[in-house]
Curated annotation (Swiss-Prot):
This is Pyridinium-3,5-bisthiocarboxylic acid mononucleotide nickel insertion protein. Its EC number is 4.99.1.12. InterPro entries: Ni_insertion (IPR002822). It holds the Pfam family Ni_insertion. It catalyses: Ni(II)-pyridinium-3,5-bisthiocarboxylate mononucleotide = pyridinium-3,5-bisthiocarboxylate mononucleotide + Ni(2+). GO terms for molecular function: lyase activity; nickel cation binding. The gene is larC.
Length: 406
């Protein structure tokens, strides 16, 4: 399993996180190519350069925009709503995985800002998430996670800082109000620095994606990235360290999860499909529907969602908000997962990623990535099944049935 391990002892911000992921090995040219799919209004440029603090070499980034002429402030004053951000991401040509990751971060940030300002998450006008540089920071991080083939994200305690910070609403205490709300999702420390160590964007990223580092975490550190911040002359280095760890796994990896479910007989299929989307955006790992017959003989659906324990509150709230059910059943369960790897396979018509699961240290089951095969089929006009076979057997004639899964 490929895990990112965050050392946030000096805090985390959106620009430091993206810089650390680039320093870790995410391809910058490919990142900019993917980011261009967002069609953000106005010109922007990702400036990436080597930097040092306290003798440690790393990467520093700036997002140069047409509107601002520079970046570096995490409290930019460009107004957008969550509805604008959602439309920007959902209508882009980014992969579904990247869209889900980015939206999960933005959604958490929007919920925190909405609570601070006393409005709804879709209607809130908030400045940090609306700035072009923050859109690039969050969407860029989601793209980098996919490029680096990250399976899971871990973090140690996150330093929030102390003092005050100046934004459009005036001088605010550190942590900023939204950061303080987001900090309920992870273990935090205070007063380790005399500045704003963690921004709302950085807090939302950790809250949406990271789990506490297990003890012990066995594996090989295959790469380390350092994101260098813009603050100078601090007693504590303004640096974010991220390590890529190839973990040593058991044959199956047990994982404690929460299942939430409800029987619903008064929602349309369109409404339950929309509910499933909202559950995934709220942090569910999976959601599904089962046909059931209720006590008065009425046909209904049992809507279920599976999530990490720390995401339970958010998923349960989305369940109530977007469904007609007055009650939700909840219980814990263990999920056992075989070790899995994903690798690109080059075919005569393009690249297809193939997932392989392992038992007893040997390949057990292979499956061609559907989205890659779908894109290949649309580009070439070949049948989808043939494109799936090309991913599994790139040098075969693809005329015969295969034993691997397509």
């Amino acid at each position: 399993m490929r895990a990112l391990v965050y050392d946030c002892s000096a805090g985390i911000s959106g620009d430091m996180n993206l810089a650390a992921l680039i320093d870790l090995g995410a391809d910058r040219e490919n990142l900019e190519r993917e980011l261009s799919k967002l069609h953000v209004h106005g010109e922007w440029k990702l400036e990436c350069r080597p930097a040092q603090q306290h003798g440690i070499r790393g990467t520093r980034i700036d997002v140069l925009t047409e509107e601002e002429g520079h970046s570096g402030s995490s409290h930019a004053h460009h107004h957008r709503t969550m509805a604008d951000i959602r439309k920007l991401i959902e209508t882009s040509a980014l992969s579904n995985t990247v869209k889900r990751t980015a939206l999960s971060i933005f959604t958490l940030l929007a919920e925190a800002e909405a609570r601070v300002h006393g409005t709804t998450s879709e209607e809130v006008h908030f400045h940090e998430v609306g700035a072009v540089d923050s859109i690039i920071d969050i969407a860029g991080a989601a793209i980098c996670l996919e490029m680096l083939r990250v399976d899971t994200v871990f973090t140690g305690p996150v330093e929030l800082g102390s003092g005050t910070v100046t934004c459009q609403h005036g001088t605010m205490p550190v942590p900023a109000p939204a950061t303080a709300l987001l900090a309920k999702h992870f273990r935090a420390t205070l007063n380790g620095t005399t500045h704003e160590a963690t921004t709302p964007t950085g807090a939302a990223y950790i809250a949406a994606l990271a789990q506490p580092v297990p003890s012990p975490l066995a594996g090989r550190i295959t790469a380390t990235g350092y994101g260098i911040g813009h603050r100078q002359g601090l007693p504590v280095p303004n640096i974010l360290r991220v390590m890529l760890v190839e973990t040593e796994e058991e044959e199956t990896s047990p994982e404690l999860l929460t299942e939430l479910c409800a029987n619903i007989d008064d929602m349309t299929p369109e409404q339950t499909a929309y509910l499933a989307e909202k559950l995934m955006e709220a942090g569910a790992l999976d959601t599904w529907q089962e046909s059931v017959c209720m006590k008065k003989g009425r046909l209904a659906v049992k809507v279920c969602a599976l999530c990490q324990p720390e995401q339970t509150d958010r998923v349960r709230e989305a369940f109530f908000r977007h469904s007609s059910t007055p009650g939700i059943r909840q219980h814990g369960m263990l999920r056992h997962i075989l070790r899995r790897e994903s690798a690109p396979v080059h075919t005569p018509h393009g690249t297809v990623h193939v997932k392989t699961s392992f038992m007893h240290g040997r390949p057990h089951y292979r499956k061609a990535e559907f989205e890659d095969c779908r894109i290949l089929a649309e580009k070439t006009g070949l049948p989808l099944g043939q494109c799936q076979l090309m991913g599994l057997f790139p040098t075969s004639s693809h005329d015969n049935d295969a034993t691997d899964s397509v």
